From Swiss-Prot:
UniProt keyword Secreted present: yes
Knockout consequences: In both sexes RNA-mediated knockdown results in decreased day- and night-time sleep due to reduced sleep-bout duration. The number of sleep-bouts is not affected.
UniProt-annotated location(s): Secreted
Outcome following mutation: residue 202 to A: Reduced activation of SPR
CC annotations in GO: extracellular space
Record gene name: Mip
Result after altering residue 74 to A: Complete loss of activity
Further details from the record: All five Drostatin-B peptides activate SPR with comparable efficiency, however Drostatin-B4 is a slightly more potent ligand.
Residue ranges the record marks as coiled coil: none
Cleaved propeptide residues: 25-63, 78-148, 206-211
Organism: Drosophila melanogaster
Name of the protein described by the UniProt record: Allatostatins MIP
Signal peptide: 1-24
């Protein structure tokens, strides 16, 4: 009787082992045949990798749009058109280039008047509130055109025409005309010098004295 119970117990255990191994094989085959999942730890791409790829594509698009907007401002002409206001050059947005020799004392207001082309008559036609200035101010205004003229000539001489200075003459003499040393140089190779003595030694027979 006890022997029969032991046999039944062993048989039941064997059936359980067989069923367990069969279930394990079924689970393994099902996981191998299923498509890769996107869950972390699965066989496919993780959710973080997918998000990184999407963010990289969005970043590329944003960079492309930003580059195009930047390129429109300096890489090609903008559609806004050219500047049509001529007064923009006198408002400080554009600073004119001033080339001087360092001797002029012209101030900025005087330079603006000279650059804008206003004449002395237009400068004297000031508003009524400016006519109430002191006599010293009027004296300064009376002598201002001469000061402007001298200052303009002093500035113009540096780049508008040749300055008749001794330094310019020395510089011009160095390459603009021949100096006396050129004649000495020309005598060395530009003309024959003692050629009769030279050709007698190698160019042809020398005239030997007869006995």
């Amino acid at each position: 009787m006890a022997h029969t119970k032991t046999r039944r117990t062993y048989g039941f255990l064997m059936v359980l082992l067989i069923l367990g191994s069969a279930c394990g094989n079924l689970v393994a085959s099902g996981s191998a045949g299923s498509p890769p999942s996107n869950e972390p730890g699965g066989g496919g791409l993780s959710e973080q990798v997918v998000l990184d790829q999407l963010s990289e594509s969005d970043l590329y698009g944003n960079n492309k749009r930003a580059w195009q907007s930047l390129q429109s401002s300096w890489g090609k002409r903008s559609s806004s058109g050219d500047v049509s206001d001529p007064d923009i050059y006198m408002t400080g947005h554009f600073v004119p280039l001033v080339i001087t020799d360092g001797t002029n004392t012209i101030d900025w207001d005087t330079f603006e008047r000279l650059a804008s082309g206003q004449s002395a008559q237009q400068q004297q036609q000031q508003p009524l509130q400016q006519q109430s200035q002191s006599g010293e101010d009027f004296d300064d205004l009376a002598g201002e055109p001469d000061v402007e003229k001298r200052a303009w000539k002093s500035m113009n001489v540096a780049w508008g025409k040749r300055r008749q200075a001794q330094g310019w003459n020395k510089f011009r003499g160095a390459w603009g005309k021949r100096e006396p040393t050129w004649n000495n140089l020309k005598g060395m190779w530009g003309k024959r010098d003692q050629w009769q003595k030279l050709h007698g030694g190698w160019g042809k027979r020398s005239q030997l004295p007869s006995n």
